Curated annotation (Swiss-Prot):
Keywords: Chloroplast, mRNA processing, Plastid, RNA-binding, tRNA processing. The gene is matK. Belongs to the intron maturase 2 family. MatK subfamily. It is found in: Plastid, Chloroplast. One of its GO terms (molecular function) is RNA binding. It comes from the Eukaryota. GO terms for cellular component: chloroplast. This is Maturase K. GO terms for biological process: mRNA processing; RNA splicing; tRNA processing. It comes from Rosa rugosa. Usually encoded in the trnK tRNA gene intron. Probably assists in splicing its own and other chloroplast group II introns.
Length: 503
């Protein structure tokens, strides 16, 4: 952050906070290169740090200085030779550098806000891992929930327009449009498996997508938090965010009543809960389904009117948690009543009291998992184990390691299940499939193979979790048993689920 501030001091007095000149500075690409070397282990390095050099960057900047190369005809865009034969490499370098430039206003705003307040507000900096306490503590007290897939803008111009509230430099925005127009099909629908999460330009597109989500949530959460004060509102106030923030400086009700005669009553729901994770959002409420339907249609109209994103209301399902399961990160979550009987005695009279409490159930999806195992030939569609014929040519240790690794990964991911019986059934299928694969390799029967090698061969399938908990609780066997049977969330399952969804 100090590097950004030092570099920007030279331009602030002359360029009026314009970011466009930074695209021609070599140190910007050096910063992008250094960040590429320090990126997370979960993000694959696509070779940008190996191919980049100072000579390539100088050549790229000299080409950008030649303004004739920036002129692109809409009807003849394929004939533009701005990058020549190094189109992919140059586009990757520019996207990395431009991502660093666009991040500067956001970083400076964060630093200035921290200096002014001198305290960090926890509710603005919540980790993605706070979703687990939300499910454990708040979810059992709610009645209805909707799992909403946040729609992607159908046009890249919408992503560019969301930056205009923070990036006040029109030249930078025009350059971004030029870049996207040159390298990507402008009218292509953006999907997570295509251009927006492309490995070569992941940083830039994640920045654009996050700015889009921030724009959407800033208005949604403001209305959600201020629902007790907003008695009258209109969708017209949401069409332009700049005008929206100018008007909230004045009394809200007076502005809405004077400027927007055609109004509608805003629904008040103090129990509404909003959670976002991995491109999805969860909207849950303790109130009636009528208010959930109002939120549902509000979101649909909000996306259509403000972001021009077509979204069908039928894709948002409102689930009653006491009757239907809720899909979350591959778990089937539901709320069931847990009734306990308490005997009370008052003087000579005694009576029984039913104490009903709601309990969160996170179930292992046994039927979809059996279908997945059947697809990769570990069992048939009925769940009967079969041999993995394609692995029969491997060594015994390699076969066992593969099966043990699959079983360990499933145990790790679904350790948050409240009932482990279905998980044990899947591990049983994997164990017998492993035995049948080894027996097929050695041209023997399963019974004969087990008698020859003994039961210790497959102990690894069931000892991994016990070894972990024995290290955590070496002396208290009762605590070990209680925790082993209970629900435990591993925080890395969010990253695992994210990688599975985008492969």
């Amino acid at each position: 952050m100090e590097e950004f501030q030092g570099y920007l001091e030279l331009y602030r007095s002359q360029q009026h906070d314009f970011l466009y000149p930074l695209i021609f500075r070599e140190y910007i690409y050096a910063l992008a290169h250094d960040r590429g070397l320090n990126r997370s282990v979960l993000l694959d390095n696509v070779g940008y740090d190996k191919k980049s050099s100072l000579l390539i960057i100088k050549r790229l900047i000299s080409r950008m200085y030649q303004q004739n190369h920036f002129l692109i005809s809409v009807n003849d865009s394929n004939q533009n030779k701005f990058f020549g034969y190094n189109k992919n490499l140059y586009s990757q370098i520019i996207s990395e550098g431009f991502a660093v430039i666009v991040e500067i206003p956001f970083s400076l705003r964060l630093v200035s806000s921290l200096k002014e307040t001198e305290t960090v507000k926890s509710y603005n900096l919540r980790s993605i891992h706070s979703i687990f306490p939300f499910f454990e503590d708040k979810f059992p007290h709610l009645n209805y929930a909707s799992d909403v897939l946040i729609p992607y803008p159908i046009h890249l111009e919408i992503l560019v327009q969301t930056l205009r509230y923070c990036v006040k430099d029109p030249s930078s925005l025009h350059l971004l449009r030029l870049f996207l127009h040159e390298y990507y099909n402008w009218n292509t629908l953006i999907t997570p498996k295509k251009s927006i999460f492309a490995k070569s330009n992941q940083r830039l597109f994640l920045l654009l997508y996050n700015s889009y989500v921030c724009e959407y949530e800033s208005i949604l959460l403001f209305l959600r938090n201020q629902s007790n004060h907003l008695r009258l509102t209109s969708f017209g106030i949401l069409f332009e965010r700049i005008r929206f923030y100018e008007k909230i400086k004045y009394p809200v009700e007076e502005v809405f009543a004077n400027d927007f005669p055609a109004t509608l009553w805003f629904f008040k729901d103090p129990f509404i809960q909003y959670v976002r994770y991995q491109g999805k959002s969860i909207l849950a409420s303790k109130d009636t389904p009528l208010l959930m339907n109002k939120w549902k249609y509000y979101l649909v109209h909000f996306w259509q009117c403000h972001f021009y994103v077509w979204f069908q209301p039928g894709r948002i399902h409102i689930n009653q948690l006491s009757k239907h399961s809720f899909d979350f990160l591959g778990y089937l979550s539901s709320i069931r009543p847990n009734i306990s009987v308490v005997r009370s005695q008052l003087l000579e009279n005694s009576f029984l009291m039913d104490n009903a409490m709601k309990k969160l159930d996170t179930l292992f999806p046994i039927i979809p998992m059996i279908g997945s195992l059947a697809k990769v030939k570990f069992c048939n569609t009925s769940g009967h184990p079969i041999s993995k014929s394609s692995w029969a040519d491997s060594s015994d240790s390699d076969i066992i390691d593969r099966f043990v690794r699959i079983g360990g990964n499933l145990s790790h991911y679904y350790s948050g299940s409240s009932k482990k019986k279905s998980l044990y059934r899947i591990k049983y299928i994997l164990r017998l499939s492993c035995v049948k694969t080894l027996a097929r390799k050695h041209k023997s029967t399963v019974r004969t193979f087990l008698k020859r090698l003994g039961p210790k061969l497959l102990d690894e399938f069931f000892t991994e979790e016990e070894q972990i908990f024995s290290l955590l609780f070496p002396r208290t066997s009762s605590t070990l048993k209680r925790f082993y049977r209970g629900r435990i969330w591993y925080l890395d399952i969010l990253c695992i689920n994210d990688l599975v969804n985008h492969e």
